[in-house]
């Protein structure tokens, strides 16, 4: 079947925001106006179509990014709703990887909140074009202009308003359209009845001022337009729109519009803006990949005639069809029932059925084209970040890198019968979520689950019960400490065993060098003259990596070291891979002992918003938790924002303490930032308790 909607008229967008900025409600309204939903649901009543996991309905927050397809004015819009809670940044990260553009939703009262910054930085990393929707213009304390200022100062982008609000809080009735230079007034509760009229007299001067900024921003995207503008000529509406689109697609600035999704104001205009200014798959650069044989770089363009290539960006267990793999098609066409190659794993896969998702209902399609987002049934070996491609034109697209978990807890089923069920369930959940890990502690035999924060693990335990009917007891959260060295050392190890017959002989000399934080592990072979034969070098590397799994201080994973193998010797008869593996392992452990090993702990970036009266208490409490106060800023509503870095080990139970210290008036958010050395006195206690 030929393509129904052209690539130019396809939009793949994400909706991203801080928790509670109104993101899911905004998506709901978009689907309502695009005709996908009959009745509008309210998120805080637990009825939203996008929030379809049980826990999401209860908590009123979005956890898994649901991909939805809808149509607006002859355009196909694929929307990915992403979670705003910091524990779920992995969902945001992988959504951004497959999107062409994004709508950032801000609360007109809260402005740019910490998670907005985190998500914005993630979008910067992938150079995703963005537009901003300032939501909740109807609530007490809404301030459009303050939010614009925060977008500029905190996110480092140039916000260009396309609209100005008419009134605010209770009196928010409509918007001024700065392109058409008219006013749009909402006449009914559903936002269906809109009246276009003249700009109110008291806003004309302000509208002219902002229109001038808008026209200048549009003109700066094109030399011809700039000349016309500088010569004092008027730009046409078409030229302004084309300029804004160009500037948005090239990430030169961020167009801003406003409304109130809950009150159904501004959502159709948001859809119009998505169609007008967000990029189509043709506007984004070709995706790069490598050929597995010779690692040559190749490009795939958004074109149905190119060989098929796609990226699997999410795996989900579905109660009706089993495993669902969400993927983005970058080039070519895919038919249901056809065979593809999972080039990341080197395995052929058969596509069973192809589904286009609408929150949690689905429509079966026979073919998907370049630029489409869909879900496939029947992919057995595919996991998040894998490339699917035409077996005759093999390519591996750049995969996604996910952060390591920072917190872990022990779990055990309440019944003996639950043990096997729990093992299977945890494996399935780990398949879905690359930042969730599960393993068995070899010393205690306990099952350990590890993730990005307390809420993350709570949701996992909750899902064990709801989806897999496994009741589990959960231990106390533990911090994921790491180890590293602080001093470069040279060590040698000669491993020789003679016990009748063939012996074991491996001799290595290595340098162990500390790396800057986050650099990871590097191994360099600097052996010259064949003092260690080539075939034994990988064994030395494997031995070192094995030893890194359990450091010398408390048995924690070792990170951020470079090891240079520069010399050694071998024996014609007695040397073996095993001997060199053991020699590498022993040499590394010796290097750790001599290299002044230190314990590292995760530090969280914490932002506390508190009334001024409690500032002293809150700061004193953060200091007592070994926090480092980075800065403070006053908000217009009498609140103070405190930014700090605090060790994760000191943050357990913080929510309860903060509530009691501020009579429930302060809020906080935190996310993992970096690892740092633990003070010696505390490190001793930690290692002694192991």
From Swiss-Prot:
Keyword Nucleotide-binding: yes
Keyword tags: Cytoplasm, Elongation factor, GTP-binding, Nucleotide-binding, Protein biosynthesis
InterPro entries xref list: EF-G-like_DII, EFG_II, EFG_III, EFG_III/V, EFG_IV, EFG_V, EFG_V-like, G_TR_CS
PROSITE patterns in alphabetical order: G_TR_1 (PS00301), G_TR_2 (PS51722)
Cellular location(s): Cytoplasm
Gene Ontology BP term (one): ribosome disassembly
Gene Ontology CC entries for this record: cytoplasm
SUPFAM superfamilies: EF-G C-terminal domain-like (SSF54980), P-loop containing nucleoside triphosphate hydrolases (SSF52540), Ribosomal protein S5 domain 2-like (SSF54211), Translation proteins (SSF50447)
Identification of the protein by name: Elongation factor G
Entry binding sites for GTP: 17-24, 81-85, 135-138
């Amino acid at each position: 079947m030929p393509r129904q909607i052209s690539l130019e008229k396809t939009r793949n967008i994400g909706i991203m925001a801080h928790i509670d900025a109104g993101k899911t409600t905004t998506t709901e309204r978009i689907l309502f106006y695009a005709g996908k939903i009959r009745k509008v649901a309210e998120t805080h009543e637990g009825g939203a179509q996008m929030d379809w996991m049980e826990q999401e309905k209860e908590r009123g927050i979005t956890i898994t990014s649901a991909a939805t397809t809808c149509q607006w004015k002859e355009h196909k819009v694929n929307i990915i709703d992403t979670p705003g809670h910091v524990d779920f940044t992995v969902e945001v990260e992988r959504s951004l990887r497959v999107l062409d553009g994004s709508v950032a939703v801000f609360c007109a009262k809260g402005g740019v909140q910490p998670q907005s910054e985190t998500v914005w930085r993630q979008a910067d990393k992938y150079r995703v074009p963005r537009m901003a929707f300032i939501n909740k213009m109807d609530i007490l304390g809404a301030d459009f202009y303050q939010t614009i200022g925060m977008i500029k100062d905190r996110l480092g982008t140039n916000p260009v308003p396309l609209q100005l609000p008419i009134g605010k809080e209770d009196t928010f009735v409509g918007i001024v359209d700065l392109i058409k230079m008219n006013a749009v007034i909402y006449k009914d509760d559903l936002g269906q009845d809109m009246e276009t009229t003249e700009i109110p007299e008291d806003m004309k001067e302000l509208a002219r001022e902002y229109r001038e900024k808008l026209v200048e921003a549009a003109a700066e995207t094109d030399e011809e337009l700039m000349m016309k503008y500088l010569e004092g000529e008027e730009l046409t509406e078409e030229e302004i729109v084309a300029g804004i689109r160009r500037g948005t697609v090239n990430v030169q600035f961020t167009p801003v519009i406003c409304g109130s999704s809950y009150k159904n104001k501004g959502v159709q205009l948001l859809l119009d803006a998505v169609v007008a200014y967000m990029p189509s798959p043709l506007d984004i650069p070709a995706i790069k990949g490598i050929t597995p044989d010779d690692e040559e770089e190749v490009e795939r363009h958004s074109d149905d005639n190119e060989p098929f290539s796609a990226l699997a960006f999410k795996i989900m267990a579905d109660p009706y069809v089993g495993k669902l793999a969400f993927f983005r098609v970058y080039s070519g066409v895919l038919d249901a029932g056809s065979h593809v190659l999972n080039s990341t794993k080197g395995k052929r896969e058969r596509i069973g059925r192809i589904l286009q998702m609408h929150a949690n209902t689905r429509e079966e399609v026979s073919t998907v084209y370049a630029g489409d987002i869909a879900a496939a049934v029947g992919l057995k070996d595919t996991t998040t970040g894998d490339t699917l491609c035409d077996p005759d034109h093999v390519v591996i697209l750049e995969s996604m890198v996910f952060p390591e978990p920072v917190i872990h807890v022990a779990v055990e089923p309440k019944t003996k019968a639950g043990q096997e069920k729990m093992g299977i369930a945890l494996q399935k959940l780990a398949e879905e979520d690359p930042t969730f890990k599960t393993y068995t502690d070899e010393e205690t035999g306990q099952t350990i689950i590890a993730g990005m924060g307390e809420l993350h693990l709570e949701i996992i335990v909750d899902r064990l019960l709801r989806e897999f009917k496994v009741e589990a007891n959960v231990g106390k959260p533990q911090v994921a400490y790491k180890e590293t060295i602080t001093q470069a050392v040279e060590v040698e190890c000669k491993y020789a065993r003679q016990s009748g017959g063939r012996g074991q002989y491996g001799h290595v000399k290595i340098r162990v060098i500390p790396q800057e934080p986050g650099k990871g592990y590097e191994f360099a072979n600097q052996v010259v003259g064949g003092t260690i034969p080539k075939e034994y070098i990988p064994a030395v590397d494997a031995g070192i990596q094995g030893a890194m799994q359990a450091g010398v201080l408390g048995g924690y994973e070792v990170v951020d070291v470079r090891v240079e193998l520069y010399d050694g010797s071998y024996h014609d008869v007695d040397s073996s891979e095993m001997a060199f593996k053991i020699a590498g392992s022993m040499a590394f452990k010796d290097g750790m002992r001599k290299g002044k090993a230190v314990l590292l702990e995760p530090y969280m970036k914490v932002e506390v918003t508190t009334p001024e009266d409690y500032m002293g208490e809150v700061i004193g409490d953060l200091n007592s938790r070994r926090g480092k106060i980075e800065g403070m800023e006053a908000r217009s509503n009498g609140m103070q924002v405190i930014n700090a870095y605090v060790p994760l080990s000191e943050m357990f139970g913080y929510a309860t303490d903060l509530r009691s210290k501020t009579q429930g008036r302060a809020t906080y958010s935190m996310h993992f930032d970096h690892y740092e050395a633990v003070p010696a006195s505390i490190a001793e206690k930690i290692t002694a308790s192991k």
